[in-house]
């Protein structure tokens, strides 16, 4: 053996050539090296619910009960993001969203070096397999072990996983191991809780800053993108206008003509259309007259139908508080245009027009309530609706002013009732079984012309074998992630509704991310599942004198 060859073998042995694969071998399919990094004093942001503002500032602790960050055992952890405005969106109390309250945003920082490991996929089974981890132990528990940190930490004291916050968004979501998260120092960034029932208003005002640098979706000019509105002023002006409207002679007379619950829906809409036209003659709403020509939503028939539908939902004994607001507000196609009224007010006082539009909307809904038997004082009903419509205005306005992105359909879109829906990729349309773990499926949704609502989604399930991961199922609109409220119905179907109103069309696209969890490796056969399609429900329409939601069905395939 030559000296040169011996030296080469010796160097190869010292460098590990011929030894077992390195920590990163096989990881390229799940790890994005270009977005992974090591940082000293790594910081991120976390949104906290009302009631936990004081406790979180004392340090991060794993909750003893609840979801502990996620329903899926693999993904239980402390969640944060690089965008403080996105973090603010998690400060609302989901159990009592109509309280008006919000918590806070905190900045959390690790001491020393932290490795951020960026993932390309969110399928825990695939990640564990490609990284050579145990397939039976929860992913995030393994991330906190010394072995994992030694293999993937590049000399750092800990490893934090990262995933895109939502499709179309440049923000990132960080998943921290609970034990590792105890080392985080906590600093208050902004406190919404001190505003009481106005906390959510402060939160939305704060979040509006997030899109300050994005180009406006509409063509009226960039100066209207993310307008800095004073919501307290708008609320006060709105309530003043409502009182003025109620005492106005013609409006007062029209209110006295309000039909009762027994009147036909057609007569009810006719009355509300007349009421709408009468209200527009009020001098306090003079600015709106100059905008009506470019905003079709001010057609009386639209307002009338909207008000009737809102009233019917409010009157329902089975609807919960969330459904009585967000569901009601997303019934009528085109109602999203109300939120874009400021875009038609180029030469006017935008804040004034916003207040006027909310006042008129509130009065219409309050006047519709008696039509279905809800005996509520008109002022009280209108004031409560002010809270809801302001929140709706903010949510949709912020969504519309985010940069639009190409839907990137890779399968033929299904066109129906003005909507266009498709699977993102062929792989998304396949539900694979025969393994424990989770899979994500993306659906692209848009509308051909007028903005249309996405009211809810119906997902087929097999309890105990194929369940919906409620915490990871969401919908994103132009990069803004909106969580969904899901509940099981009829045992084998899960019903999910966006927690904030969602509209698509006119350049606005939505990405629905459905996450399924398999607690068993048992194979699933197609005849076991109640339906072979996912249903997307849109606006309400009347078919054979019966109200139904527009429904789009996307068929999937079961494979083992």
From Swiss-Prot:
Disulfide bond residue pairs = 211-226, 486-496
Q: Which Gene3D superfamilies does the entry mention?
A: Diphtheria Toxin, domain 1 (3.90.175.10), Diphtheria toxin, receptor-binding domain (2.60.40.700), Diphtheria toxin, translocation domain (1.10.490.40)
**Residues that coordinate or bind NAD(+):** 46, 90
Signal peptide (UniProt feature, chain positions): 1-25
One GO cellular component assignment for this chain's record is: extracellular space
Q: Which UniProt keywords apply?
A: Cleavage on pair of basic residues, Disulfide bond, Signal
Residues forming the catalytic site: 173
Q: Which SUPFAM superfamilies match?
A: ADP-ribosylation (SSF56399), Diphtheria toxin, C-terminal domain (SSF49380), Diphtheria toxin, middle domain (SSF56845)
Which top-level group of life is the source organism from? Viruses
Report a single Gene Ontology molecular function: NAD+-diphthamide ADP-ribosyltransferase activity
Look up keyword Acyltransferase and say if it applies.
no
Additional information: This diphtheria toxin homolog is a nontoxic cross-reacting material (CRM) produced by a strain of corynephage beta that had undergone N-methyl-N'-nitro-N-nitrosoguanidine mutagenesis. This treatment induces guanine-adenine transitions in the DNA; the differences from the wild-type sequence at positions 104, 187, 222, 456 and 532 can be explained by such mutations. Either of the first 2 mutations will completely abolish all ADP-ribosylating activity of fragment A. The last 2 mutations may be responsible for the reduced receptor-binding capacity of this protein.
Q: What protein is this chain from?
A: Diphtheria toxin homolog CRM228
* Species of origin: Corynephage beta
